[in-house]
Amino acid sequence: MSPRMTDYFKRAEPAFKAMFSLEAALTASPLDALLVHLVKVRASQINGCAYCIHMHVGEALKDGEDPTRLHLLAGWRDSSLYSPRERAALAWTEALTLVAETHAPDEDWAAVEAAFTPDEQAWLTIAIGAINIWNRVQVGFRAEHPATQLHAA
């Protein structure tokens, strides 16, 4: 896989500055950082963004996330390792990431309403939208994850 463009950050600098400002706001939001990491990794898995998976798994581990929970994240529905709050966030992540298929079901929203305050509901939805923007940019430009020293067997 070859990158399609390597200087896209410079070519759309004002847009990327706004995206980085959004990330700073999300960091300061009332959402727990480990929950946001789970959301970012799960959306990135669905979108097939190796660059973002690599980044957000690394950040989650650095912030103290358990490696087993990250390994099982794609199968979260079949694991007891995720709290009801995390399960609501992950279901909402999948619903919004796959919105053309799911149409953001009312039952997923009801779980979000039950687990999160109104402020957190807004921030969670923004966090999901933000990672989907990043995924589409990185996948679209075929950004290479930095683990290039590893090779396929």
Segments (PLM) and residue ranges:
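Hydrophobic alpha-helical segments
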Residues: M1-A153
